[in-house]
């Protein structure tokens, strides 16, 4: 599905040049909130790491450990910091806080 939406940043005129953050998202394939969150990330030209955890209880437990116990999908991490799910992602965007967050490079380990 990722290839299907690769044209979105080109259509919108958005370039991924300013995106330096490491973005990770835990998803289920048929989850509408996951699809909506990925659509916003694609629209912005974000290259993200997707963990598809459909039916994988061990992966879901690992996600919950990172997400302060939250077990719902999607769970989105920017530079290893949990930002929550789809609603939180769109909230950051509507408040103008998502783009600066995406422009922040990850801290070197």
UniProtKB/Swiss-Prot annotation:
**Which molecular function terms from Gene Ontology are attached?**
glutathione disulfide oxidoreductase activity
**Gene Ontology cellular-component terms listed:** cytoplasm
Keyword flag Electron transport = yes
GO terms in the biological process aspect are: cell redox homeostasis; cellular response to oxidative stress
Which key words are in the record? Disulfide bond, Electron transport, Redox-active center, Transport
What SUPFAM superfamilies is this protein classified in? Answer: Thioredoxin-like (SSF52833)
Location of the Glutaredoxin domain: 11-109
Q: Where are the annotated coiled coils located?
A: none
**Which pairs are disulfide-linked?**
31-34
Which family is it part of?
Belongs to the glutaredoxin family.
Q: What does this protein do?
A: Has a glutathione-disulfide oxidoreductase activity in the presence of NADPH and glutathione reductase. Reduces low molecular weight disulfides and proteins.
Spell out the NCBIfam families in the cross-references: GRX_bact (TIGR02181)
- What is the name listed in the Swiss-Prot or TrEMBL entry for this protein? Probable glutaredoxin slr1562
Q: Which species is this UniProt entry from? A: Synechocystis sp. (strain ATCC 27184 / PCC 6803 / Kazusa)
